[in-house]
Amino acid sequence: MLTHYDEAVFGKILWQAARSKWWIVPTSLLYALLSAVLILYAMAQAWWFYIPVAIAVSFFLWRIYEVHQSVVLVTEKMLLVTNGYTWEKGAGYFPKREYLAVSYKEIVGFSHRFTEMTVGEPTYGGLAQISVPFAFLSPSDKQKLVSYIEEKQGNAS
């Protein structure tokens, strides 16, 4: 189910996992370099060229911000996987982050590259694979996530 984080429903956030620094730093530097090159190029162009450059630089800055955000929230009751943004009525002009909520007892496993999560009941037609952005988590965060899920599943039994 896609939802927004609500402490009353999901409990407190115990920890968050973001992308690995080995992914964040080069990606951020690439976007910063592209922004700098565009700005320098625009300085030698006509004034009207500043508008598309400003849009492109704004996009690059937003991507730098996004690459630093958490991709998974581990809460007391469920695992929340980052999905994107929605425009909610009453939220003004600011989008609200949306999460895929998955119960710990429904998680069966992950693909070997952590690009997919298998959920459901291990019966015929009872499993589903969901694409998840866990490929760029650090190895320690991946292990911590798997250990916590196994711990929660052990307590639920």
Predicted features along the sequence, with ranges:
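N-terminal membrane-targeting/pre-transmembrane regions
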Residues: 1-41
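Short hydrophobic alpha-helical membrane-anchoring segments
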Residues: 36-44, 63-66
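Conserved beta-hairpin
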Residues: 60-101
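Acidic, Ser/Thr-rich low-complexity segments on the non-lumenal side of membrane proteins
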Residues: 87-127
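A membrane-cytosol interface segment of integral membrane proteins
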Residues: 118-157
